[in-house]
Amino acid sequence: MTDKPQPGGLGSIGTAAVARVGYGAMQLFETSPDDAAAVLRRAVELGVNHIDTASFYGPGEVNRRIRAALAPYPDDLVIVSKVGARYTGEQPIPLAAAQRPAELRAAVEDDLSQLGLDCVPVVNLRRMDLGPAVGADGDQIVELDDQLAEMIALRDEGKIGAIGISSVPLDVLRRALPAGIVCVQNAYSLLDRSQEDMIDVCTAEGIAWVPYFPLGSAFPGFPKVSDNPVVLDIAGEIGATPSQVGLGWLLAHAPTTLLIPGTRSITHLEENIGAGDVALDAEAIAALDAITTPGTDPWAHGVEPFSEATQR
């Protein structure tokens, strides 16, 4: 037994037990190395043992900052990366597809080198079936089976511990299940519930459901959970912040949910981790469940919604 805090309670990703509130490191490229280290160390102090990253964050700089701040790593720390894109630095979208099997392998090798690991515990295959931000064309349109064969080979070689998948519709997840998928990362929040069937499958299969954009999109022109009047009312009633209500609803909504909210601020980090202590009663959950959502996936057409939003 341990008295170490477990924000949000205990969940799992593959065979690893993790706190249900983790940390998404993407924004650490946008701050100084010292500030990045402070955020990472504070996260671990508060019980975070699931950190999400990618070699295309930076490029590679976020991985290097994680290593500088936390290595030698705590025994219980699960670092999750993703492959399938590469950093370009171009605006408004600094990423391009890198979907070919050789590119997936190269990205894993980058993770190993940048993070100083012999094996990345979990690596997500970031497909281009759903958005946002990055699409695939030409030789970047790659068969799922070819990609999974490379991921399985990497797992068999001990370079990765387990395989996840990201930005995919339900039919692609079903096709991928025989590969031993341990987590799914798709866009999902209180205001975008187009993935309910996906959540049902994850729950039935014991797969970690790890939503990105858990508080609504950070892109211009898209709704944010913290602006919703129902969320604001409940936050005021229970003495929580709107963000904590939105994250707390996600934890209550599905038992295999793991959260990886990102921030470069220690204040916001502590707020996000505090969502694990938010208690929503049945009345509050019913009110949040009743919030009207579009009912369709806003990212179903890949890059277009992002491009339109950036022009508003």
Which residue stretches match the model-derived regions?
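Short, acidic/polar
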Residues: 31-43, 99-115, 169-174
